[in-house]
A protein has these predicted regions:
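Iron-sulfur cluster-binding electron-transfer modules in prokaryotic oxidoreductases
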Residues: 1-304
Length: 304
């Protein structure tokens, strides 16, 4: 279906963006551009990456946005893990984490998503299951369990907890690998000024707001903290699609704070936030760039 969508988007696509949707969909692109669907999803491109033979393996849970819109983020993660002597496995059976279904009250659908992902992610003997999307990380680590508990599906809880014990967010894992001496940063780097946006799930549920900042600082970036760095960008998954009239002013406040920081690059750990903020800045013809932390670190880390 997404391959068909890639072809169908062509009349609306300009570069990496869809800037205008027609008719009843126009509200979605009135205040921000949307990312174009990638020509090839990560689940395909990752097969073309020549990974070194490694004793240790991790499973990468991509999530929908990285898989189908931003495969370059996943490719950057593979590059970093390989430098640490870790092979990245992409379990083919992974699907949506179920967060949109759960937040819409469709718990039965969310439970099916959870079971599908548990089966896929526990099929390989891996040290960690890593995600570069905080919303997905929260789903895998916490919400699969709470969904099964809410539905009384107690038989599914042991494997959900087994998965939760392996789940870790990208920045926390990289920080751990650096602290263990398995990765190191290039010396003497002065990479300029950036600003950092805290995704809601990363800071408030995973409590991992300092790890990315520490990594970016170690890499050689000067972080110009924006005002209200931890205020929501207005994305909120399907929230921004269903309630654009509320999402738009929240995004505008974030964009003002980014511009006022004086940085020409805004970095964040959430592909959903990248989609929202990059799309908003593009709509305003801003020269400020937006990237995921994984992309900023991929070329600055070396094997120890």
């Amino acid at each position: 279906m997404l391959r068909a969508a890639y072809v169908m988007q062509k009349p609306l696509q300009k570069g990496n963006f869809i800037r205008h949707l027609p008719f009843f969909l126009s509200d979605m692109t009135e205040f921000r551009s949307l990312p174009a669907i990638a020509e090839a999803p990560l689940r395909d491109t990752i097969k073309t990456i020549q990974q070194p033979a490694c004793k240790e393996k991790i499973a990468f849970y991509a999530g929908c946005l990285i898989d189908f819109a931003y495969p370059e983020m996943g490719e950057a993660l593979v590059k970093i893990m390989n430098k640490a002597g870790i092979e990245v496995v992409f379990p083919e059976g992974q699907t949506c984490c179920g967060a949109p279904a759960r937040y819409s009250g469709a718990y039965e659908v969310a439970a099916q998503n959870a079971n599908d992902n548990i089966n896929a992610l526990l099929a390989n003997d891996v040290t960690y299951v890593v995600s570069a999307c905080p919303t997905c990380t929260v789903a895998l680590k916490h919400e699969f369990i709470s969904t099964f508990e809410s539905l009384g599906q107690t038989d599914s809880l042991p494997r959900a907890r087994q998965l939760a014990d392996k789940v870790i967010d990208f920045s926390s894992l990289v920080k751990k690998l650096v602290d263990e001496g398995r990765l190191k940063f290039k010396e003497g780097q002065q990479l300029g000024k950036i600003t950092y946006h805290d995704s809601c799930h990363l800071k408030r549920t995973l409590h991992a707001s300092q790890e990315p900042r520490q990594l970016l600082t170690q890499a050689g970036y000067e972080i110009a903290e924006m005002y209200e760095a931890d205020m929501c960008c207005g994305m909120g998954g399907t929230y921004s699609l269903k309630l654009p009239e509320i999402s738009a002013p929240i995004l505008e406040r974030k964009l003002v704070n980014i511009k006022n920081s004086g940085a020409t690059l805004a970095v964040m750990d959430c592909p959903g936030c990248v989609m929202q903020i990059r799309g908003g800045l593009d709509k305003q013809n801003s020269t400020v760039r937006v990237e995921h932390t994984v992309q900023r670190l991929a070329d600055e880390l070396e094997s120890s």
